[in-house]
From Swiss-Prot:
Keywords, in A-Z order: Acyltransferase, Cytoplasm, Iron, Metal-binding, Transferase, tRNA processing
Cofactor: how and how many bound: Binds 1 Fe(2+) ion per subunit.
Native organism taxonomy: Bacteria, Pseudomonadati, Chlorobiota, Chlorobiia, Chlorobiales
Name the UniProt record assigns to this protein: tRNA N6-adenosine threonylcarbamoyltransferase
Cited Pfam families: TsaD (PF00814)
Molecular function GO terms recorded: iron ion binding; N(6)-L-threonylcarbamoyladenine synthase activity
GO biological process, one term: tRNA threonylcarbamoyladenosine modification
GO cellular component, one term: cytoplasm
Sites where the protein binds substrate: 136-140, 169, 182, 186, 284
Gene that encodes it: tsaD
Disulfide bonds listed in the record: none
Protein family: Belongs to the KAE1 / TsaD family.
Cofactor names: Fe(2+)
Localization annotation: Cytoplasm
Amino acid sequence: MNILGIETSCDETSAAVLSDGTVRSNVVSSQRCHTDFGGVVPELASREHERLIVSIVEAAITEANIAKNDLDVIAATAGPGLIGAVMVGLCFAEGMAFALGKPFVPVNHVEAHIFSPFISDEPGHKSPDGDFVSLTVSGGHTLLSVVRQNLDYEVIGRTIDDAAGEAFDKTGKMLGLGYPAGPVIDRLARDGDPKFHRFPRALTSSSQTSKSYRGNFDFSFSGLKTSVRTWLEGHDAEFARQHQTDLAASIQDAIVSVLVEKTIAAALLHKVGAVSVAGGVSANSGLRSAMQAACNKHGLDLFIPKATYSTDNAAMIATMAQLMMARGRYRENSYGVAPFARFKAAGKGTR
């Protein structure tokens, strides 16, 4: 079965072909037009998707060495994301499916991230044997979920203000690192001292709210942004520049330690044997290293997608569509689905 996946939820235009569960192509175009604005401009994102969508889809089909008529299913992100951006891919996919007489499957972008560590592009790819705890962490989302084998999942924690990826980008902008700042902080942090300054870790066992921590798996990163700004305002600009790597390491340590602590605590509380980390921030080397060390300490298996599949991509959309169809979560004639901006958990028992 050949599935075409299309992803346009934010600032990546992507199309991929999944053939019998294996990725045959995954074409991604990351928009550079937002750099000068210090963040994604929704209208520009939509226009870029419109400009690129045809060529990206054609490239994915060509790279997979198939014809359009060889496609069996068309899938696309229905949300969450920037509404205008989502609509470009969604409407294109619906129109293509209708024209070819193929089934159309709308996919929840966050659910696709949750299952992205299990994208198969080589033989022997492993998946958890049982339930697992998933940390989905990106510029727009920070979620902790307990995932069941039948695709049901329970969201047990989410950010109450800023997502972790947003915290990376905005604190990096304060340091003058440009946009996106997350990868730059990751690179600088490798040469810095994470103990240079201890920035706050909200809603953790080491924070002032520790009495209410037990069972609280929500996240908060707005205080970190305020703390970084306060530190910069209280120190000479030249001193801050000289210690840029130390500041990057300290910021990264504050974010990563919270993500790791809560994820491991959730895994132990729910007695699962595996943890997965997905989303754009899962590409962060500090997070990968710290999570692996924590999982090794507690005897947990760790699943993280390849860097190619960490950021937004269409291979995860096609993979999620295949999982939905295999487990009966696909409804025939899904045309006309309304795009949505905010995350809607589809699993049972979610909050």
